[in-house]
């Protein structure tokens, strides 16, 4: 089945919403804004560790931490350029200071490098499940079979059973909360990514039919285990769009790997070729 091209836009689809920030008109207002932003960062740390819900998934923390300080910096530069353009004889010298300040964008460059490094995040698929990924591909792309929809056991049911299984093991309250957040996040990412990143070309006509027949139904209530497994092949790329720190990301990956172990343990009942059926000749014409 799911590091950065959307934002969450699993490659092209998921995108984090940008917040609009009002620009202050006075320098003291700018300072107060910056102080407010810095105080916000202090509170964001523990919330990320608790995997607080945020778009594009539920693991993003507060994506608006950096934009406020960035917008304040741009405001300062613009204000410094304006008086320079108004000095009659010094107009040729005025543009020089802003150019020097552009060279001070080292922190931005460093953050971009860190961002690229986080694109290397990979979710490890258990060895027991890798053969099924191959068989799933073969059934659909080579044998031209389709997974029968709606699934006998849909994604929502699988996630609910996993959550109940973890809760029955007597986890502490905060761990139980984390499991609920992880399950909700997996479901959210699945519904967002399915249409653009989790389907083979041959399956797209079937997906279009599902949208017509169930326009208001989340795809997690229609599709099943094979497509859920495909999600974890691509979800590592989507995690690159979240501002989680290293500790929070490691914690999240631990929960995702635990869920994959659950899928591997129950693979015999979740993955079977009998859930596929050869597509009709009419469907083949649609898929061309």
Curated annotation (Swiss-Prot):
MRG domain: residues covered: 117-288
Record's compositionally biased regions (Polar residues): 1-15
Chain spans, region Disordered: 1-113
Residues modified to Phosphoserine: 71
Keywords: Chromatin regulator, DNA damage, DNA repair, Growth regulation, Nucleus, Phosphoprotein, Transcription, Transcription regulation
GO biological process: chromatin organization; DNA repair; positive regulation of DNA-templated transcription; positive regulation of double-strand break repair via homologous recombination; regulation of apoptotic process; regulation of cell cycle; regulation of double-strand break repair
Pfam families from the UniProt entry: MRG
GO CC terms, sorted: NuA4 histone acetyltransferase complex; nucleolus; nucleoplasm; nucleosome; plasma membrane
The keyword Transmembrane belongs to this UniProt entry's keyword annotation: no
Localization of this protein: Nucleus
InterPro entries the record matches: MRG, MRG_C_sf, MRG_dom
Subunit field text: Component of the NuA4 histone acetyltransferase complex which contains the catalytic subunit KAT5/TIP60 and the subunits EP400, TRRAP/PAF400, BRD8/SMAP, EPC1, DMAP1/DNMAP1, RUVBL1/TIP49, RUVBL2, ING3, actin, ACTL6A/BAF53A, MORF4L1/MRG15, MORF4L2/MRGX, MRGBP, YEATS4/GAS41 and VPS72/YL1. The NuA4 complex interacts with MYC and the adenovirus E1A protein. MORF4L1 may also participate in the formation of NuA4 related complexes which lack the KAT5/TIP60 catalytic subunit, but which include the SWI/SNF related protein SRCAP.
Functional description taken from the UniProt entry: Component of the NuA4 histone acetyltransferase complex which is involved in transcriptional activation of select genes principally by acetylation of nucleosomal histone H4 and H2A. This modification may both alter nucleosome - DNA interactions and promote interaction of the modified histones with other proteins which positively regulate transcription. This complex may be required for the activation of transcriptional programs associated with oncogene and proto-oncogene mediated growth induction, tumor suppressor mediated growth arrest and replicative senescence, apoptosis, and DNA repair.
UniProt protein name: Mortality factor 4-like protein 2
């Amino acid at each position: 089945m799911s590091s950065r091209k959307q934002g969450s836009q699993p490659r092209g689809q998921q995108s984090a919403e940008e917040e609009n920030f009002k620009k202050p008109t006075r320098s003291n207002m700018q300072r107060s804004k910056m102080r407010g932003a810095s105080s916000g960062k202090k509170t964001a740390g523990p919330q990320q560790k608790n995997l607080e819900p945020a778009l594009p998934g539920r693991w993003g923390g507060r994506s608006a931490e950096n934009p406020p300080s960035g917008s304040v910096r741009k405001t300062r530069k613009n204000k410094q350029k304006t008086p320079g353009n108004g000095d009659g004889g010094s107009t040729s010298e005025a543009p020089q200071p802003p150019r020097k300040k552009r060279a001070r964008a080292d922190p931005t460059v460093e953050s971009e490098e860190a961002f690229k490094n986080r694109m290397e995040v990979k979710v490890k698929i258990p060895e027991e499940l890798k053969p099924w990924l191959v068989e799933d591909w073969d059934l659909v792309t080579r044998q031209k079979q389709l997974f029968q929809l709606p699934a006998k056991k849909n994604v929502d049911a699988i996630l609910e059973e996993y959550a109940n299984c973890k809760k029955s093991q007597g986890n502490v309250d905060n761990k139980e909360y984390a499991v609920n957040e992880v399950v909700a996040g997996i479901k959210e990412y699945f519904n967002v990514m399915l249409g653009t990143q989790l389907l083979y070309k041959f399956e797209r006509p079937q997906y279009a039919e599902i949208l017509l027949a169930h326009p208001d139904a989340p795809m997690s209530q229609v599709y099943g285990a094979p497509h859920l497994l495909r999600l974890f092949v691509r979800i590592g790329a989507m995690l690159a769009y979240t501002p989680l720190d290293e500790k929070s990301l490691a914690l999240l990956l631990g929960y995702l790997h635990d869920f994959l172990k659950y899928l591997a343990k129950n693979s015999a009942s979740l993955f079977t070729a009998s859930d596929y059926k050869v597509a009709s000749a009419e469907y083949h014409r649609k898929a061309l």
